[in-house]
Amino acid sequence: MRVLHILNELRPSGAETMLRAASGLWHSRGIQGEILVTGESFGEYAPCLERAGYRLHHLPFERSPLYLWRVFRFLGRNRFETVHIHCERANFWYAALAFVSGRPRVVRSVHGIFAFRGWLRCKRFVQRYVLRRALRTTTVAVSPTVQRVEWMSYQNPSLRIPNWFDSDRYHPASREERAMARRGFGIPDNAIAVATVGNCSPVKNHLAVVSALGSLPRPWRVVYLHAGCEDSSREEARLAERMGVEARFLGAVEDVRGVFAAADLFVMPSLHEGAGIAALEALGAGVPALLADVEGLRDLRDVADCEWTAPDPDAIAAALRRCFERNPEALRERALQASRRIHENFSVVRGASEYADLYRSGTGARP
């Protein structure tokens, strides 16, 4: 069975890491995955997905009828049994083209919170209605918050298949692995390593973490590790330098297990999330975590015993002080308990199996 996944540029973020983690299970169930990349370039994560067994295609997005014609021809030439749309941009048009080209199943995963306003909200309302009623598209929400926002904003019913993380890869590190990782990043034994993971877009709010770290009293020696792409301005790095924060900006990291092994605390200060994969990975790896009490991340409260904060610098600084003042062994024991619950609830087997069943059945939540 051939399944086409449609994404923007491939980066080491949620949907892409989920696809990599699920490739083995899907292959064992006779599902061959291919990816249509619609960004300007394939993206830095493309080689990783190719190694996982995906065949990649590239049609850079353009706002023109000619682009839609190219996508239609591509779909017509390839006999995909299912088309799975992961991007918000042009999702309606991809679903419509898949439908008219005769693809029997169209699945659209909503990976983020899209509470648009004004004219765009009206437009998306109509599009989602047509997707559901006329184009027979199955909508999947990746978290309770996403499912609620889709219903409240667009009256759009959806299945809920939770995001997953690579539960075979992210496990608590041994003492030896932890010591090796800290040496690799040059972290002294007496330092507290605080880690963030993800691109440096405004919604990820990493500037607030840097500001909070810069305001902490100097008795604590803190090393800030960031794995993920910075934007061209390198605003986070420049702020860290101005505020005297000892930082390691690592750029895109294909495998962040080493970052988690070295970390004493993982921080996710996002303004909102669909379902934060990096948080699942860190919690699955047994790292004590400080999460922003915001939509998307809040869905983890029932399963993750961790610290919570408002996403502003002052609140983050106060939460960091609380974490640093606590017994580190007690924090790590709580994190190990959270790791077990995360593995139970967000394993790749659970989520990817539900999608495999959906691909084969073609059924969904339709009124």
Positions of the model-derived regions?
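N-terminal strand-loop element at the rim of the active site
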Residues: H5-R63, V146, E230-S232
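Short hydrophobic beta-strand element within catalytic cores of glycosyltransferases
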Residues: L36, P288-L291
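Aromatic "clamp/platform" in nucleotide-sugar-dependent glycosyltransferases that forms part
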Residues: A252, L271
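A short, active-site helix/loop in glycosyltransferases that binds the activated sugar's phosphate group
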Residues: L135-R160, F165-H171
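A conserved mid-protein helix/loop that constitutes part of the nucleotide-sugar donor-binding site
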Residues: S13-G24, I192-S215
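Conserved acidic donor-binding segment of nucleotide-sugar-dependent glycosyltransferases
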Residues: V303-D314, R322-P328
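Short His-centered aromatic/hydrophobic patch
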Residues: I85-F92, V110
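Nucleotide-activated donor-binding/catalytic signature segment of Leloir-type glycosyltransferases, i.e.
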Residues: E236-G251
